[in-house]
């Protein structure tokens, strides 16, 4: 009995420690500057101001990370004329994107349906941007052979019909950037679809020459190592790269890994992504092509996530196309599932994803019925409690019987307290005589721990709960309770539940158990309100069930 109780206490303490560390990593990696700590003098504010064309021209060529690839074809000389790049702004119902005509790079992505701060309704979330304080951009091009992009050639100098595009009442908006080579015309086409964060990037090559035209499509995500400011006790979720490989459906490649050396893999299809809390950017190259992936740190100190597709060849006097998808938006599980296999795994539900994923679908279904995520969490808690009703009842019956045996156990302790072996033997005889399973109160609780851990990660990772209100003072279920009312209620319910449990025979164990409500209350003050809400409701239901069972057993004598 003692070893199992000790194991249960140890398991709870270990889980608490792990969750606390995940929540309190703000003190680590101080050598990496955070975005919030950058100097105040920023040349281009995140959203309100649009960088000038001159700024675009200088920033676009600052990082020489264009791949130099070998393709058997007649090279095309770079144009000699003076080129003035332009910044193209595209606005849909969910995105505002800024594209540089010098290379056709994505320099800024604003998510119009997501706020940077819930307190400011006029400030949408800026996912990607480039200014003096921060670099996070996406690039793509055609390199090698006849391609206009390259480390030596520089970037393709595109022209555009206009610099502002809006979706309006249409389902799609198409932005064409054009480039005239000596014997070919290249159109880089961006297609934006209503209510979608996936941008189709397609190259249309019209070969006017008598020889084949050939180049390789590449795409890059370039980001510095700065991290968002999470604030005091703020959770530090994973920020870094992730990729799918032939061996592993989802593999993280951290910035530290790239500091140690490049990560390379070649496969058919696939994807490469940069993930952060709630949001993701990802290149999804041609699914039927063999693509080479490389994740590395550049000489400029930025992290480069790159794919290079196989050679695209266009026959003489023919038209050819090659395209890739670029996603920049929230980590919505259903959207990501539709885009590419295993891309939904970037929603990091931890090693218990196979439990957390069904929990989210259940929560999402309930939310569709009630329209409030807080109410949905309460109803999901009731559902989970119903699933574990009988295992919990077994546990509470065992605990109630153990409470009845405490006077006899105390008597045995006085009689055989110095002889632990004799004491253990007499306890087992007592359990057998009274038909009590000393393990019955612990095992059902251990069975429920994976569900709690899964629910923790599900609530932490679900962008759907970001900035979502419950009622009254709780206006965001994804952050801590501002008044700490829920954590205090959680501590009270834990204390009441302990009073219904048998007192551990070991004084040290008893002291540890007495301190747990206080420790958990302090810890949960900094947990998301949605998670604490689950715990409070679960404890309340458990108290009700345990009280009824304990009272019935005590009445039965």
Swiss-Prot record:
The keyword Cell membrane applies. One of its GO terms (biological process) is protein transport. Pfam families: 60KD_IMP (PF02096), YidC_periplas (PF14849). It is found in: Cell inner membrane. Interacts with the Sec translocase complex via SecD. Specifically interacts with transmembrane segments of nascent integral membrane proteins during membrane integration. NCBIfam families: PRK01318.1-3 (NF002352), PRK01318.1-4 (NF002353), yidC_nterm (TIGR03593), yidC_oxa1_cterm (TIGR03592). Belongs to the OXA1/ALB3/YidC family. Type 1 subfamily. PANTHER family: CYTOCHROME C OXIDASE ASSEMBLY PROTEIN COX18, MITOCHONDRIAL (PTHR12428:SF65), OXA1 (PTHR12428). This is Membrane protein insertase YidC. It comes from Saccharophagus degradans (strain 2-40 / ATCC 43961 / DSM 17024).
